[in-house]
Amino acid sequence: MQRSPLEKASVVSKLFFSWTRPILRKGYRQRLELSDIYQIPSVDSADNLSEKLEREWDRELASKKNPKLINALRRCFFWRFMFYGIFLYLGEVTKAVQPLLLGRIIASYDPDNKEERSIAIYLGIGLCLLFIVRTLLLHPAIFGLHHIGMQMRIAMFSLIYKKTLKLSSRVLDKISIGQLVSLLSNNLNKFDEGLALAHFVWIAPLQVALLMGLIWELLQASAFCGLGFLIVLALFQAGLGRMMMKYRDQRAGKINERLVITSEMIENIQSVKAYCWEEAMEKMIENLRQTELKLTRKAAYVRYFNSSAFFFSGFFVVFLSVLPYALIKGIILRKIFTTISFCIVLRMAVTRQFPWAVQTWYDSLGAINKIQDFLQKQEYKTLEYNLTTTEVVMENVTAFWEEGFGELFEKAKQNNNNRKTSNGDDSLFFSNFSLLGTPVLKDINFKIERGQLLAVAGSTGAGKTSLLMMIMGELEPSEGKIKHSGRISFCSQFSWIMPGTIKENIIFGVSYDEYRYRSVIKACQLEEDISKFAEKDNIVLGEGGITLSGGQRARISLARAVYKDADLYLLDSPFGYLDVLTEKEIFESCVCKLMANKTRILVTSKMEHLKKADKILILHEGSSYFYGTFSELQNLRPDFSSKLMGCDSFDQFSAERRNSILTETLRRFSLEGDAPVSWTETKKQSFKQTGEFGEKRKNSILNPINSIRKFSIVQKTPLQMNGIEEDSDEPLERRLSLVPDSEQGEAILPRISVISTGPTLQARRRQSVLNLMTHSVNQGQNIHRKTTASTRKVSLAPQANLTELDIYSRRLSQETGLEISEEINEEDLKECFFDDMESIPAVTTWNTYLRYITVHKSLIFVLIWCLVIFLAEVAASLVVLWLLGNTPLQDKGNSTHSRNNSYAVIITSTSSYYVFYIYVGVADTLLAMGFFRGLPLVHTLITVSKILHHKMLHSVLQAPMSTLNTLKAGGILNRFSKDIAILDDLLPLTIFDFIQLLLIVIGAIAVVAVLQPYIFVATVPVIVAFIMLRAYFLQTSQQLKQLESEGRSPIFTHLVTSLKGLWTLRAFGRQPYFETLFHKALNLHTANWFLYLSTLRWFQMRIEMIFVIFFIAVTFISILTTGEGEGRVGIILTLAMNIMSTLQWAVNSSIDVDSLMRSVSRVFKFIDMPTEDKPTKSTKPYKNGQLSKVMIIENSHVKKDDIWPSGGQMTVKDLTAKYTEGGNAILENISFSISPGQRVGLLGRTGSGKSTLLSAFLRLLNTEGEIQIDGVSWDSITLQQWRKAFGVIPQKVFIFSGTFRKNLDPYEQWSDQEIWKVADEVGLRSVIEQFPGKLDFVLVDGGCVLSHGHKQLMCLARSVLSKAKILLLDEPSAHLDPVTYQIIRRTLKQAFADCTVILCEHRIEAMLECQQFLVIEENKVRQYDSIQKLLNERSLFRQAISPSDRVKLFPHRNSSKCKSKPQIAALKEETEEEVHDTRL
């Protein structure tokens, strides 16, 4: 960045903002880069501002019981705020004084006041000076207030971030990431521009009082008629505003429904294409869009009438103010024109400035209160450590994740002791304790000496991670003692990578030691990986390490923990992403050798690790199942394998455990209050929803760590009756909305499921910050596209014969990615706050305007209609103004007024009252035409938005994957969320305002030019200057806004990054470093925003300066060229004053239109994307109709001769696949053939191209060569027909928000009987029947209530329903429990017995039934043969497979020889495998 010219700027340069000229000149000539932006002044740095506010807030906390954040802000910013407020008031006062001078100028043309004619020129000079003074006062004041608002936002940004790093884990479990982002964006953004309006809460009343006093002097009591009308109008607008809010709230839910489905479609676009669901998804989204648009139109109509009421209220204000006076005392032109000028200012103060000021204060105080509540949340408390101790000890430790359970625990014990004394009931305490919820850890005892290794094992949800959290101090024990030195290093289960180099991630702020660093790199097997990078360990990693594989991220996280010199190392399942060989080497070299003298606690379930551990702690349901050595474990606990593997079924849990699971699940799987569920119809009802439960569930958030043991209150306990009720003041659930907030405040969009018929259960959830920290987010990506994490679920019980409790318990142990439909993950969050600069020009091109206008043919006619109405209005206005300017004056001798009252001509003749009749008629006509003139325009523009959304949706669905791979998912979603919201909400009204203002200005100029032709000569250069100035400024301003948006992104991504690694940050004590990084991100954004505000004020000031020159010319031309008669000069000067404010408004509106039209440009860019195939008629099958000979889905009503494919024979010839056209080949010259009904297994190492081959079969990539199915080439039929020949079970399971029926049969072509039959075949019937509504049960959030196994069965059912002859399976057994895996194998044998099956699988057992194997290596087919031939001595396959796996392939060879001995085997740690970019 460059040094700012502001530092050396003179006072005059600062006053006129001339110091911004270099950046404006550069932006006009070339594209601006970040290096062109000026550095911020030191007073605006985040360090200084945050320190200042933090000092005052600490002072407030220390001095009062009820601290107020507004007091801290007042001490920091109040006096500067008031200083600029006084300047703003003085500038507004000049607006009230100007009509007085105008009246005196008009009066000087009265024939009876010829002696004052000589001072008219001086009055004109005074009037011009008032405009100059107003300009010099208002713009510095407005800029100063914007500057203060910016500083307040920066200071509170920093304060919130620092508080976030201090929050306890319990609090983080109750706060969603959406709340934090909303706190930092929606709330704090109100200070930036809203602060300039805040002063009008006192300026507007003072101004109204001053104006009413001046109008009273002119019109006496009739002045209050106009004021009364304005007050009624303000109330009317307030009513319209409330109506608009109602429609907006209703519409918000519909928008969110559409965005949920759209985001799911975008994230799973490859699956949508593989299933041929383009038409179904398009129809589903368009139906939601149709419902949304009905409410959009209603809200737009209300906003339109609200805007129109302001524009056309001026006629009635003047009319109601003047009429009573004129009826009594006659028409006085001076008073009419003076009153018109007063009423213009009065109308703005009453109907705009004061309501906006009140709204600003309401929103700002609300935001301050929210921030204040957040700043008073419970903080993370560091445990007291003994630095001299060398051992780690836990004695009788019990802990709850729920805040306050420790106090409830102690209260229950006390009550129990009291009752035992009086009643002697020993069991009472334990019954009360069961009501309080299950502890996450209970009575934990262990002791390890320095240098020992403690292995902690247990099933999912047993409390392993919670144990580490308690040692770190993240979880406070309710009772018991913890003892250790406090020098801790931590490696999280889910790898966390901060933005920076590999070296910076490993060192992480610790002093650099070359020898130690190299030793750690070697021990963690990172040498080979680092050597492959050109920059070695100085390669910069993106946020989350998106350029690394899962194994690389895991090893870097482990290296970071090992590099720190600590006494105690906490390793939470660090080997989850590593292959067996790498895991073994790292465990030996790193854990056992490099850290041999250190105390280590390793969470693992690997038998090899347990054998080498000094001590073993096995947890089961939060309790210590075993503690001792491995030999003791084998002797004392021979059944420990089941506890270790987590094979307990739900029915085997204790009654207390089952109750905790059920209530916790219901907490999180909350029911919509208005869901049409008839519980009385369900005999299997196992719970009741009470009012207390309804309130509690609103605040529930899934925490995978303690999901089984968290407590949910269904009924009030005795302790609650005594007033001990937890979380009674917790704020209601809030989410981050994808829809831009309106000017009235933020819109919190409720999560509403897709509409369906029949009994439904609608569910919603949100993600807590703690959940974000503990998510296993899969970060697989391809060379062009970063995909969103797929959802992974782990089952607690077998997948068949489930009870209703089992169904709901599936929600507990899931490991799910943060979905964009609910909360936005870090990559999508970045996308949602700025758009890529891409190829969109800085200024919207005329071609975009032309295309927009011609989208809907009627739009052109509507614009012509508006122009015709405008011409009629101008003509009517000319008639009235001509009458006022040329009304014959009454003879002085017949005047009823004395000399003292004749400052202006008075028209009292009865015949002259026709002026009023004409004025009333014209006013009524203008009101009618004005109110309804723009309505067709707004209606048509919303229709245009509807058409553009439809075209863009169709274009995205039909676009090839090679094009979609070059786009980011967040960017695509932005088009459907932010840009469509702009087209729906902002653009129609902004275009209407601009056209309205432009026509008003043109009309006023036309009237002035008719009355005084000389003025027209001065108007032409002014208009030219405006156009040139606008073009000059627009080039730079749009670029600065783009840079500002881009600079906003790091703020929020840094917040999410910090939250995901918060436990690591605290363990390493790196909070100050991350605060510094956050301040740098704030300063970067501030530099762009401050420069944008400065250039905007430069532009606004230049506009006023041009107009001041114009007004000076108009004033002197009218004064010097006008003869007798005050009417004409009054009209000219009044209209000139009106032109000033209106033209500025029009120019600003034109800039807004240009900015909003950039959204239209982006939408057109998506519409213009290439399509996969030429448009063809729908190939949707009909159950009772004959189809063409090229058939896709087999149908019992169709003759066999018409069915294709009939056998499933495939021939692949010279197949080459590329991700993008012209890119490197991923597969080269693949040739082989598959016989009908044959089963082929794909073999190869990770990244060899197995999943890519399956994608190539579906033509999802750029392909060359030929594939034939039953003799039909893929070039001879459409893509839809080709893809429907395949059944697909993808690696990334796709469950969209909708009913079971919709997910299984989106085209609604099968009957319930047929769907149930298939559900029986795949083992889903027992699962679906447990849900209320059965097939009509609404699944949300990617099927959050289903395990991963259930979702795989859903995909299997889809393939069975499709009756495809070729089945593609991409890692179908990944993360499946044995029961579901057996169901899939059985279904493949039965339902697909005569189908061709192509299987990509890592499990050797899954390959047993394949007749042929295709070995892929280095993107080519190396071998294609039977398993027997592949296992010969020369085979590459034989070299890759271990001897034990060979035995598994042929178990019959050894089964008869000897009976295998029972062995104790451990299940692999339940973590997500790395998902590759080529997955289906």
UniProtKB/Swiss-Prot annotation:
Monomer; does not require oligomerization for channel activity. May form oligomers in the membrane. Interacts with SLC26A3, SLC26A6 and NHERF1. Interacts with SHANK2. Interacts with MYO6. Interacts (via C-terminus) with GOPC (via PDZ domain); this promotes CFTR internalization and thereby decreases channel activity. Interacts with SLC4A7 through NHERF1. Found in a complex with MYO5B and RAB11A. Interacts with ANO1. Interacts with SLC26A8. Interacts with AHCYL1; the interaction increases CFTR activity. Interacts with CSE1L. InterPro entries: AAA+_ATPase, ABC1_TM_dom, ABC1_TM_sf, ABC_transporter-like_ATP-bd, ABC_transporter-like_CS, ABC_transporter_C-like, CFTR/ABCC7, CFTR1_ATP-bd_dom1. Its main location: membrane. It is found in: Apical cell membrane; Early endosome membrane; Cell membrane; Recycling endosome membrane. GO terms for biological process: bicarbonate transport; cellular response to cAMP; cellular response to forskolin; chloride transmembrane transport; intracellular pH elevation; membrane hyperpolarization; multicellular organismal-level water homeostasis; response to endoplasmic reticulum stress. ATP 2 binds at residues 1219, 1244-1251. Residues 1-77, 147-195, 244-298, 359-858, 940-990, 1035-1095, 1152-1480 are cytoplasmic. The modification Phosphoserine is found at residues 549, 660, 670, 686, 700, 712, 737, 753, 768, 790, 795, 813, 1444, 1456. It catalyses: ATP + H2O + closed Cl(-) channel = ADP + phosphate + open Cl(-) channel; chloride(in) = chloride(out); hydrogencarbonate(in) = hydrogencarbonate(out); ATP + H2O = ADP + phosphate + H(+). It holds the Pfam family CFTR_R. Residues 423-646, 1210-1443 form the ABC transporter domain. Belongs to the ABC transporter superfamily. ABCC family. CFTR transporter (TC 3.A.1.202) subfamily. The gene is CFTR. N-glycosylated. Phosphorylated; cAMP treatment promotes phosphorylation and activates the channel. Dephosphorylation decreases the ATPase activity (in vitro). Phosphorylation at PKA sites activates the channel. Phosphorylation at PKC sites enhances the response to phosphorylation by PKA. Phosphorylated by AMPK; this inhibits channel activity. GO terms for cellular component: apical plasma membrane; chloride channel complex; cytosol; early endosome; early endosome membrane; endoplasmic reticulum membrane; membrane; nucleus. The modification Phosphothreonine is found at residue 717. Residues 99-122, 217-222, 320-339, 880-918, 1012-1013, 1117-1130 are extracellular. Glycans are attached at residues 894, 900. ATP 1 binds at residues 401, 434, 458-465, 493. Epithelial ion channel that plays an important role in the regulation of epithelial ion and water transport and fluid homeostasis. Mediates the transport of chloride ions across the cell membrane. Possesses an intrinsic ATPase activity and utilizes ATP to gate its channel; the passive flow of anions through the channel is gated by cycles of ATP binding and hydrolysis by the ATP-binding domains. The ion channel is also permeable to HCO(3)(-); selectivity depends on the extracellular chloride concentration. The chain crosses the membrane at residues 78-98, 123-146, 196-216, 223-243, 299-319, 340-358, 859-879, 919-939, 991-1011, 1014-1034, 1096-1116, 1131-1151. It is a multi-pass membrane protein. This is Cystic fibrosis transmembrane conductance regulator. One of its GO terms (molecular function) is ATP binding.
